[in-house]
């Protein structure tokens, strides 16, 4: 008998740092101009679930699309490298033409 647990906890993504770099690179290639940390997090979690890169994926269905704090730090470190290499910059303020989430950070891809 299989038992499925439902969880609203942050999703424990199990990408290595190198795998996470690839996932973020793939996402940035699809971005036309700007993105939010929230949108990137959604993409990473959705992809991790599809690829089986989530702890307890076989027995847990997550209703959250937030990453764990440790995964968020890895993503932040990778984004910092993109900023340092002038491939992405932080966009301060709000954009009325995009979805805005409280305490979210927007980024612009340098083309």
Residues covered by each model-derived region:
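Charge-rich, solvent-exposed alpha-helical interaction surfaces
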Residues: 19, 23-27, 43, 47, ...
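Short amphipathic alpha-helical interaction segments
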Residues: 67-85
